[in-house]
């Protein structure tokens, strides 16, 4: 029988051993453009990541390269292009990503350059502080701003800007391929939630948050606005934050009297509806992040003041919730994209299953997402022979991208969990189902730890030397919410 507490203690220990990193879990990381020495202009400006505590204490500043250094390119942003400087963080909190230009500070009218002469750059900054700006794009985004970049694994990236739609690029590459087809091509921010790529736009009839294809596109896929979001003139949507699958917050940079602020959208049935807008006094918001802890949503945003702007926070207690100023930057600098350094709980699936005489076994979860402190989280197995045995193979790490054949098992049998940390015996009920409770403690050091799971089913009616069937693989990411 699985000793859940021992397993989780091992997870915590492995995290603690790797926890000596420059960025601290739970802190805010924000893009800053400019040094403060001179007024911001349309020329390229030095770009930084500033780390703050949620109480507004500046912890450190990490400078992006301003010149070629080894394989790392310069990564700068236009001083007055407020749509540039979006920041993202991978679901496992390992990598921050932002986009910029391979140009020295002071390069005039940087957004008007061609990408052949001035490649657009994707910066990947690890939570360990390692900067990688070796990824460039020289075939699109010419004569326009490059705005946002996002990754799910640190090797494959998506980027967008004022033209060219969504593009996909590979770490260290110099070109990109289209990941979106047709309109819109003028996009603002990208994000990944539960392994689905999303974008925001204020172009044409795409005036809110849209999905890009299904999952993470490998070819050009259509952009589809989420049902219920506006399709007529008015909204000016930028960054967005999914608190859960049915709640999405969107930063709108219009003045509050025109609907600007942080909009709360709620999914009802198959349609999204605007619940209310949280509006700060005397300013608006453009970039947005947040946390959900114990059911309480706390949002962090950067204000729309041109320079010397602020980080704002608000706890969503309903319409009219007050904002607090967390920190203010220097004159002649601008804060843009913002993210909370915190892993998000996620579950995804991959691979192919192998049938028994009753079909392909299933693997899944109940009790909500695998967030730390969730006592109800449970692994499930199904579609196995009734009143029989099976196994839950569990590994600490990523699911194998290529399955491993097992001698004696059917030709279709592939194992995706390797190495296996624990094999748990399952006994199925009359419906061929079994469950494995896996309550998660509130141990923040475990945030971001991956768990690979696969169900193995025994079937004595099969003729193979090893009469086994297998589910597809399930990847679990332990998160803070």
Question: Where are the regions a protein language model picked out?
Answer:
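Short, conserved, GDST-rich strand-edge loop motifs in beta-rich repeat architectures
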Residues: 26-41, 98-117, 205-210, 311
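Structural motif
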Residues: 44-46, 107-108, 119, 164-170, ...
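Signature of short aromatic-glycine-proline-rich micro-motifs recurring in repeat-based ectodomains
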Residues: 45, 71-99, 140-157, 162-163, ...
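Beta-propeller blade signature
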Residues: 45-54, 113-128, 263-265
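Surface-exposed loop and turn segments in beta-propeller and other repeat-based domains
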Residues: 58-79, 123-144, 215-234, 276-284, ...
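Loop/turn-rich, solvent-exposed surfaces of beta-rich toroidal or solenoidal domains
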Residues: 234-311
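Blade-level signature of beta-propeller repeat domains, shared across WD40, Kelch, NHL, RCC1
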Residues: 304-344
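N-proximal, solvent-exposed segments at the start of the mature chain
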Residues: 343-481
């Amino acid at each position: 029988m699985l000793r859940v507490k021992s397993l989780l203690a091992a997870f915590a220990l492995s995290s603690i051993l790797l926890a000596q990193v420059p960025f601290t879990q739970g802190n805010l990381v924000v893009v800053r453009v400019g040094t403060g020495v001179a007024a911001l202009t349309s020329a390229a400006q030095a770009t930084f990541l500033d780390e703050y505590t949620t109480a507004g204490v500046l912890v450190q500043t990490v400078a992006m390269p301003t010149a070629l250094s080894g394989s790392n390119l310069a990564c700068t942003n236009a001083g007055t292009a407020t749509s540039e400087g979006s920041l993202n963080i991978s679901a496992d909190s390992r990598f921050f990503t932002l986009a910029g230009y391979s140009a020295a500070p002071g390069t005039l009218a940087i957004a008007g350059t061609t990408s052949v002469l001035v490649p657009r750059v994707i910066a990947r900054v690890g939570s360990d502080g390692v900067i990688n700006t070796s990824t460039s794009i020289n075939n699109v985004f010419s004569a326009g701003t490059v705005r946002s970049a996002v990754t799910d694994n640190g090797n494959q990236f998506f980027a967008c800007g004022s033209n060219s739609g969504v593009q996909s690029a590979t770490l260290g590459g110099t070109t990109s391929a289209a990941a979106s087809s047709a309109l819109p091509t003028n996009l603002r921010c990208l994000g990944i939630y539960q392994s689905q790529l999303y974008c925001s736009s204020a172009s044409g009839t795409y005036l809110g948050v849209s999905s890009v294809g299904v999952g993470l596109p490998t070819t050009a896929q259509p952009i589809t606005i989420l049902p219920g979001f506006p399709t007529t003139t008015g909204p000016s949507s930028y960054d967005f934050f999914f608190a859960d699958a049915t709640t999405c917050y969107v930063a709108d940079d219009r003045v509050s009297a025109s609907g600007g602020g942080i909009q709360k959208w709620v999914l009802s049935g198959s349609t999204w509806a605007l619940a209310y807008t949280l509006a700060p006094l005397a300013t608006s918001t453009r970039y947005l992040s947040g946390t959900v802890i114990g059911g309480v949503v706390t949002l962090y945003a950067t204000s729309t003041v041109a320079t010397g702007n602020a980080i704002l926070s608000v706890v969503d207690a309903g319409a009219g919730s007050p904002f607090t100023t967390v920190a203010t930057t220097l004159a002649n600098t601008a804060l843009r994209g913002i993210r909370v350094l915190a892993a998000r709980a996620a579950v995804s699936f991959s691979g192919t299953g192998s049938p028994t005489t009753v079909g392909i076994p299933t693997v899944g979860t109940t009790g909500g997402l695998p967030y730390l402190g969730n006592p109800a989280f449970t692994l499930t197995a199904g579609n196995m022979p009734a009143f029989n045995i099976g196994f839950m193979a569990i590994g600490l790490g990523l699911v194998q991208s290529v399955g491993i054949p097992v001698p004696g098992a059917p030709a279709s049998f592939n194992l995706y969990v390797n190495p296996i940390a624990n094999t748990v015996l399952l006994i199925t009920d009359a419906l061929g189902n079994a469950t494995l409770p896996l309550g998660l403690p509130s141990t923040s050091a475990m945030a971001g730890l991956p768990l690979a799971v696969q169900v193995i089913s025994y079937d004595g009616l099969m003729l193979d030397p090893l009469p086994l069937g297998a589910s597809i693989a399930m990847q679990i990411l332990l998160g803070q919410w």
